[in-house]
Amino acid sequence: MTSLSSQPAYTLVFDPSPSMETYSSTDFQKALEKGSDEQKIDTMKSILVTMLEGNPMPELLMHIIRFVMPSKNKELKKLLYFYWEIVPKLAEDGKLRHEMILVCNAIQHDLQHPNEYIRGNTLRFLTKLREAELLEQMVPSVLACLEYRHAYVRKYAILAVFSIFKVSEHLLPDAKEIINSFIVAETDPICKRNAFIGLAELDRENALHYLENNIADIENLDPLLQAVFVQFIRQDANRTPALKAQYIELLMELLSTTTSDEVIFETALALTVLSANPNVLVPAVNKLIDLAVKVSDNNIKLIVLDRIQDINANNVGALEELTLDILRVLNAEDLDVRSKALDISMDLATSRNAEDVVQLLKKELQTTVNNPDQDKAMQYRQLLIKTIRTVAVNFVEMAASVVSLLLDFIGDLNSVAASGIIAFIKEVIEKYPQLRANILENMVQTLDKVRSAKAYRGALWIMGEYAEGESEIQHCWKHIRNSVGEVPILQSEIKKLTQNQEHTEENEVDATAKPTGPVILPDGTYATESAFDVKTSQKSVTDEERDSRPPIRRFVLSGDFYTAAILANTIIKLVLKFENVSKNKTVINALKAEALLILVSIVRVGQSSLVEKKIDEDSLERVMTSISILLDEVNPEEKKEEVKLLEVAFLDTTKSSFKRQIEIAKKNKHKRALKDSCKNIEPIDTPISFRQFAGVDSTNVQKDSIEEDLQLAMKGDAIHATSSSSISKLKKIVPLCGFSDPVYAEACITNNQFDVVLDVLLVNQTKETLKNLHVQFATLGDLKIIDTPQKTNVIPHGFHKFTVTVKVSSADTGVIFGNIIYDGAHGEDARYVILNDVHVDIMDYIKPATADDEHFRTMWNAFEWENKISVKSQLPTLHAYLRELVKGTNMGILTPSESLGEDDCRFLSCNLYAKSSFGEDALANLCIEKDSKTNDVIGYVRIRSKGQGLALSLGDRVALIAKKTNKLALTHV
């Protein structure tokens, strides 16, 4: 018998009977006996699905031989050969089943059939057979098919020769000579390709000889043959390094002449595997770039770009000259393709080409302004801005021009993109102090166009921290004064509203004159009206008037007093700085007086009903604190120590904190770059390959990265599995019912990426045969039962095994439940055994992920489902709870460790992020503190996701943490 690994594997792509109806072998036998060809086709499909689900049904073989095999229906014959592929051909003792003799006669008859498609289909079936006893009788017919007139037959005949030799060499001892003679005489390119595949694996010398004979005309060969030549060269070059130089030269020639996209892709990848020389890599990658630009399929573009990214990661610095060529891919409309191309170009960018990259991206940025598809253009614009920011931060010579470029677009951007530009300006000013004055001036000039309050708050912070000289402070102050508008704000707005109302009354002609007079209240008194009680004032303000207001005035009247609090801090910073750089008391006093007027005006309008939302307590406290500081400054008895303390709090602390944050980010970036570079550093004890000794040491063979990727794609993580995997399976065995039940059941649960597999074992614990025993499963949540177990009979104390696959479509909490059903004795009603519920662990589908602050906030605002969980835990520290939360939810911490505080801190707040295997995003915000009375950890965890299920599932995991950590203490008995 052949080994298990050599057996073919099958995947059920589509179930033609989704009604979940189950049929017994008797039902199938009756359908085959009496049905027409069309009914037999449906029956055969059901039989194939049932067999692929794990029920071999060997008792059907004779019925299929009798009632299906004689049919002339082409579709039925095609299904019949599918059945021959999967039917058990050996008996329990390992010998060939007697019925297969009849099958062999039918197969031999089809191998001599006058219809070439039946012959070809039969030969293709033979390539999947692994039983030497069956194949032995087919050899003469297969050899006869090698000379058939139709190429469709010959292409499968040569593959059948190859596969028969692989199963058993003694069946075709001269297979190498047969294939070699066939390929020399053959004219059809597909037949040649199939023959060369077999020759390359069985007879390397003859394959190399055939390649040498066709080298001169390789550019004129069929692309199919060129592709297998490239595959042979890539594999043989690793085995025989002496020929590598000649192979590379041949591949370079083929790459420059071929027009087939498939051959270009394979040849370019083969060159990158065989050589790390930039003279070889650059032309190869250039061809890949041309391919990515030319093809229309976005999936192919992404595959090609992924390969280019891998090549650059393995050969750092070799592809720098292709930076601008990569950006040609930006002509694609797909945002993912553009993002991938920009990422690669940033990896390739250097100080030599940074200016050209920025110029090209600037042109792309300008094209987004007039794009009719505004949503897509806005996303692409944000992507371009993010890339340009990266260039400017990395290369100082581009920073100044990039800042002015981005500031030109800041008025057209949404809040996220605009605030991103301001954050970038903060970083540039801190990193490159020589650009401070120029950047500050440009920023102040463009702030009138800013529509985002968040971006404007960042700009206010920059003005307060980096305005140094007297002229700079006055320039910033002038902008603030103009941005506030006419003060006092309350009186000027009331005046404007009154004028608008009078103008409206003059132009309106009321059809029915209504008496006007004072309003009399129910208690008989006259009503009075104050500016603080105006409710309808906002109705008199049009959208045009609201948009025409200067920025700070617009934010204040719309109820954004957080910006007003930032403005108050900025004003204090500017006043303190101006006192240090100027001795002009008149100007200083004028600044303080104007500052007091602005801040008091903001407080008064914030307490009125003119604003859309009244001022909150926190903002009011911060503004009033600033007013108190300004009033204290007027006091001549103020001590120098108090002034010094004030300057430290406002001028030194925040700036030094931001500087430290930049340094930490720089260190982390350096660590990541060092970690990435270490992947390509070879250890000092790596063996050196000498061509002269290649024949002596055959074990020193270079790894083929393409073959490794292929194995990883086919086997997944199984290629890394160790012998301990069988032991770890014991942990996944779950009892489905108890030992006292008439049928004992247990399941080994295996979680794959998109499904859960239950290997179920049933044990008949009675002394009777259980007839028509079957298991019914059902699910709760986003789970779907793919396989339906068939009915079976289980002898006394007998065993029955079957496999059930459950499709998982999301990371929601899922439950699998069911029962065992079997017939009662002597015609009694069916009996049931209720099974325990199986809970699908969602943690197997959730992995930690990373995201920048900008992306996190965007998702947080977009996601509509929120689950807020109260936290009360007896863990000793806040950091201990955070560790338990990360362990229990598989989420990654986004907040830098420096911002989390010490282990004994009394307050902790951080953001967490994870992605599921299905592409779902899960966001979390943790806000906890130490209760001063009970010393417990208290607070909240807020979880957001696009769907409700994931938020609830993670909420259950958070609640489970509290149950595990809160232990009841036994105080007395």
From Swiss-Prot:
Modified residues (Phosphoserine): S181, S540
Inactivation phenotype: Causes a block in ER to Golgi transport. Exhibits exaggerated ER structures displaying interconnected networks of ER cisternae. Cells arrest at all stages of the vegetative cycle.
Iron-sulfur recorded as keyword: no
Keyword Transport: yes
One Pfam family named in its UniProt record: Adaptin_N
GO terms of molecular function: structural molecule activity
Keyword terms of this UniProt record: Cytoplasm, Cytoplasmic vesicle, ER-Golgi transport, Golgi apparatus, Membrane, Phosphoprotein, Protein transport, Repeat, Transport
Post-translational modification: The N-terminus is blocked.
HEAT repeat coordinates: 98-133, 134-170, 279-317, 318-354
GO terms under cellular component: COPI vesicle coat; Golgi membrane
Note: Present with 26000 molecules/cell in log phase SD medium.
Assembly information from the UniProt record: Oligomeric complex that consists of at least the alpha, beta, beta', gamma, delta, epsilon and zeta subunits. The complex interacts with ARF1 and PAB1.
Stated role: The coatomer is a cytosolic protein complex that binds to dilysine motifs and reversibly associates with Golgi non-clathrin-coated vesicles, which further mediate biosynthetic protein transport from the ER, via the Golgi up to the trans Golgi network. Coatomer complex is required for budding from Golgi membranes, and is essential for the retrograde Golgi-to-ER transport of dilysine-tagged proteins. Required for mitochondrial morphology.
Protein's name according to its UniProt entry: Coatomer subunit beta
High-level lineage: Eukaryota, Fungi, Dikarya, Ascomycota, Saccharomycotina
